[in-house]
């Protein structure tokens, strides 16, 4: 999988695109002369909680009350209340994916398409099986669709209290753990990949 590391990441999120757009331009102006923009991607919500495969995304996310334990460094360690972020841009092979019958898509995902119920006899190469959080550890995802009608996919946005959880999931998807590759990766291609440390709000306040 590609490594396209940059020095820093700015992630803006909001329901009003014009406000987000103006904030982004303001940030770019503020850092002019100190840093340059290496890459920019705009995303949006699609059918409430689905990605552009048509499946519900984030079904395995912990509940909001449990999310801090999965995503944030514990107190007493360096970077406490911060998180490791894995950011990847996955370009979908939409025509190939949409040509598959729904039951085939469900076996690739390991879940039903309408209500995201995990299949009892899911294939070992299904996406759910290759990224089993009960095996690798819990993470918190905030994935978003991106792109145009002709070129689109998923921005993977994964937060974890332990970078190894994320790296082991990637190794499993690529088939480096057992030799079994994630079937979903035949229909979506990673274009970028980078890790960032996200400090706590309190840590950022102390920088002022």
Regions found by a protein language model. Give the residues of each.
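Long, histidine/aromatic-enriched segments associated with O2/redox biology
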Residues: 1-208
């Amino acid at each position: 999988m590609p490594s396209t590391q940059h020095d820093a990441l700015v992630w803006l999120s909001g329901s009003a695109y014009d406000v987000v757009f103006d904030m982004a331009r303001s940030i770019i102006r503020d850092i002019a002369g100190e840093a340059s923009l290496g890459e920019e991607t705009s995303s949006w919500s699609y059918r409430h909680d689905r990605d552009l495969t048509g499946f519900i995304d984030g079904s395995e996310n912990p509940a909001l009350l449990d999310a801090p334990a999965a995503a944030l460094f514990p107190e007493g360690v360096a970077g406490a209340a911060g998180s490791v972020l894995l950011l990847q841009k996955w370009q979908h092979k939409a025509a190939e994916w949409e040509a598959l019958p729904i039951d085939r898509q469900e076996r690739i995902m390991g879940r039903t398409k309408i209500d995201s119920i995990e299949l009892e006899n899911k294939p070992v190469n299904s996406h759910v099986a290759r990224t089993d959080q009960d095996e690798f550890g819990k993470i918190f995802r905030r994935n978003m669709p991106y792109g145009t009608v002709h070129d689109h996919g998923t921005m993977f946005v994964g937060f974890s209290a332990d970078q190894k959880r994320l790296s082991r999931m990637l190794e499993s998807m690529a088939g480096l753990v057992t030799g079994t590759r994630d079937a979903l990766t035949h229909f979506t291609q990673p274009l970028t990949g980078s890790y960032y440390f996200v400090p706590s709000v309190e840590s950022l306040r102390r920088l002022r």
